[in-house]
Amino acid sequence: VQGFTFSNVTVNAFIIGFNHNNTREGGNRIHFLIGKISGKDVALCDSKYNNTGTDAGFRMNKSNSNAGGWNGSYMRKDVLGNSGSPANPPVNSLMAALPADLRNNMKSTTKYTDNTGNGQNNASSVTATTDYLFFLAEFEVFGSRSYANSAEQNYQKQYDYFKAGNSRIAYNHTN
C-alpha cells in the first residue's frame, strides 16, 4: 500500500455500528474499523508516520497543508482508494489490499467533513463525500469536538461503540 508491504499480517475488521447516522450516511450499512491485531486496536502506519514529505506513504497529504480538506486529500483518494471502487480499486491502495470477498460486500457511505481546509471553520466548508473507506471524525469518536470544523458535528453522530466506553486509542500496528 503506497510503498509499504504488509507481510504475514492479519488485521481483523470489527463492527462499530449498524445503520449509524442512517438519515445522512445511508441506510442498511454496517460500519466497521480496520482493525485489531491479537485483540489490540491498531492503526496502519509506515515509516512516514508523523513526517511530512512528497513521497508515497501513509500521510494525509504530500504537502504540509490541509488545503482541499478530506475530499482533496491524498489519504482519501490514493492511500485508502476512494478514487476507485471496490470492484476496481486503485493500484497500491488499502482498498486493493483488502480481500475480494470483503470488497464485494462493501457499500458506499456519505460522510460530512470540512472539504475546504485551511482552518476556515465555517459551515459552508462542510460538504459530503461518498466513500468506501474513511477515517472517523473527531465527533464520531469522542462525542465532542476541539479541533475539527465546528459545523461538522451538525452532520455527525458519535458511534455507539465509543459511547459504550470502548477504547479510543489505536496503536501503531508495527509495535
Which sequence ranges carry the predicted segments?
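Collagenous Gly-X-Y triple-helix signature in extracellular proteins
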Residues: 1-175
